[in-house]
């Protein structure tokens, strides 16, 4: 699908210079002299190289339509993560570095969304929130209730985050997987 250069938004995948690029940052610039343009930071989906390009409003680029499919996480084998297509039951193997730091949040049976272009995986989305157990947390210090302070904690998957002082080791909490931040404590009632 063809779009104008000023319609490129972060997250769009475009075909440029013979390969696929994802728009990371976009900045619409309207100089006092000359025509408006869109300053776009692009990242190559194959090798990860970055490129800064200017697209005039009048020029057109090819926006690539990605297919989104749900997969279930099965297991990790070395550096490979194995997923199963929820419709065809075919297995997909991705390298751990493809998922990045968020791979630590993968749990057995978790449903993730994989973005595909011509059956080739380009991106993966985990659920926005996951429930994890705190492995270690510093004890709360008395008198710290006046200010809203947070203390460091280590989750069962090894990720370090900041939690409120009332949260203790062994408790289950909900974490935002995009920002790696504490959301709330899981209630005991279920």
Swiss-Prot record:
Q: Could you tell me one molecular function GO term of this UniProt entry?
A: translation elongation factor activity
Q: Which UniProt keywords apply?
A: Cytoplasm, Elongation factor, Protein biosynthesis
Instruction: Identify the SUPFAM superfamilies for this entry.
Output: Nucleic acid-binding proteins (SSF50249), Translation proteins SH3-like domain (SSF50104)
Chain segments annotated as transmembrane: none
Q: Which InterPro entries match?
A: Elong-fact-P_C (IPR015365), NA-bd_OB-fold (IPR012340), Rib_uL2_dom2 (IPR014722), Transl_elong_fac_P/YeiP (IPR020599), Transl_elong_KOW-like (IPR013185), Transl_elong_P/YeiP_cen (IPR001059), Transl_elong_P/YeiP_CS (IPR013852), Transl_elongation_fac_P (IPR011768)
Q: Does the keyword Flavoprotein apply?
A: no
Checking Pfam families in the record gives: EFP (PF01132), EFP_N (PF08207), Elong-fact-P_C (PF09285)
Q: Name one GO cellular component term.
A: cytoplasm
Cite the Gene3D superfamilies for this sequence: 2.30.30.30, Nucleic acid-binding proteins
Q: Which CDD domains match?
A: S1_EF-P_repeat_1 (cd04470), S1_EF-P_repeat_2 (cd05794)
Q: For this UniProt entry, what is the primary localization, expressed as one broad class? A: cytoplasm
Whether Flavoprotein counts among this entry's keywords is: no
What pathway is this protein a component of? Protein biosynthesis; polypeptide chain elongation
Gene Ontology process terms (BP) = peptide biosynthetic process
In which compartments does the protein localize?
Cytoplasm
Purpose: Involved in peptide bond synthesis. Stimulates efficient translation and peptide-bond synthesis on native or reconstituted 70S ribosomes in vitro. Probably functions indirectly by altering the affinity of the ribosome for aminoacyl-tRNA, thus increasing their reactivity as acceptors for peptidyl transferase.
> Into which family does the record put it?
Belongs to the elongation factor P family.
Spell out the protein name for this chain: Elongation factor P
């Amino acid at each position: 699908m063809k779009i104008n250069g000023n319609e490129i938004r972060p997250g769009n995948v475009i075909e440029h210079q013979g390969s696929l690029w994802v728009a990371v940052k976009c900045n619409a610039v309207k100089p006092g002299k000359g025509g408006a343009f869109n300053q776009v930071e692009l990242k190559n989906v194959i090798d990860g190289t970055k490129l800064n390009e200017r697209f005039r409003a009048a020029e057109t680029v090819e926006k690539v339509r990605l297919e989104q499919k749900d997969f279930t996480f099965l297991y990790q084998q070395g550096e490979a993560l194995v997923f199963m297509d929820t419709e065809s039951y075919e297995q997909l193997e991705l390298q751990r570095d493809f998922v990045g730091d968020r791979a630590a949040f993968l749990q057995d049976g978790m449903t993730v969304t994989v973005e595909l272009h011509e059956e080739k995986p380009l991106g993966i989305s985990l659920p926005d929130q996951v429930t994890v157990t705190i492995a270690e947390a510093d004890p709360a210090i008395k008198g710290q209730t006046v200010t809203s302070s947070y203390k460091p904690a280590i989750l069962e998957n090894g990720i370090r985050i900041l939690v409120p002082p009332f949260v203790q080791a062994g408790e289950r909490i909900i974490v935002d997987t995009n920002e790696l931040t504490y959301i709330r404590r899981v209630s005991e009632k279920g």
